[in-house]
Amino acid sequence: MDLFSWQLGLPATLLCLAFGYLLGSIPFGLILTRMAGLGDVRKIGSGNIGATNVLRTGNKKLAAATLLLDALKGTAAAAIASLWGVEAGIAAGLAAFLGHLFPVWLSFKGGKGVATYIGVLLGLAPLMVPAFAAIWLAAAKITRYSSLSALIATAVMPIALYATGYGKVALLFALMTVITWIKHRANIQRLLSGTESRIGEKG
């Protein structure tokens, strides 16, 4: 079945994986907070290096910069590799996502991946980014849970991609969605117990 075929050669696949992983593993949240004199972001809040935890430092601009850079590293990996074909973009995009989640420089303890997920989406299927944003915003308005909004948007995205003809890219995002949900398992437990912080609340 063509959907599951892989034509990119092994050397090229490995090169794309290495390229994507190196880009994705750059811990912008940690770098920016240290440069700003705010210390180690891993020692506050959730201990995460992503934008949500950077926001807990009280520096909104730094959190926004972290969000943007974490997304753009996924975009850069996927878009640049895609110059050699969609499979190259898929390999690099997946590796960038995994690099953010499991950076070798931080003992494989990284972020939860939503920003990089969006970045890879921008690199491989840019027309779907507004759909992701609309789903997230609608869910956030209704539930006021950032984590639940992300879980809903990531769950819908592989289906939307497949329905609009993205094929292999849809399979990539199905895999990334499963990983995203696993990385959010603590959030899911708090949502089920009613202890998850809502948007605008501290915690």
Curated annotation (Swiss-Prot):
The keyword Cell membrane applies. The chain crosses the membrane at residues 12-32, 66-86, 88-108, 118-138, 159-179. Pathway: Lipid metabolism; phospholipid metabolism. It is a multi-pass membrane protein. One of its GO terms (molecular function) is acyl-phosphate glycerol-3-phosphate acyltransferase activity. Its EC number is 2.3.1.275. InterPro entries: G3P_acylTferase_PlsY (IPR003811). It holds the Pfam family G3P_acyltransf. GO terms for biological process: phospholipid biosynthetic process. It catalyses: an acyl phosphate + sn-glycerol 3-phosphate = a 1-acyl-sn-glycero-3-phosphate + phosphate. The keyword Cell inner membrane applies. It is found in: Cell inner membrane. Catalyzes the transfer of an acyl group from acyl-phosphate (acyl-PO(4)) to glycerol-3-phosphate (G3P) to form lysophosphatidic acid (LPA). This enzyme utilizes acyl-phosphate as fatty acyl donor, but not acyl-CoA or acyl-ACP. NCBIfam families: glycerol-3-phosphate 1-O-acyltransferase PlsY (TIGR00023). Probably interacts with PlsX. Belongs to the PlsY family. This is Glycerol-3-phosphate acyltransferase. The gene is plsY.
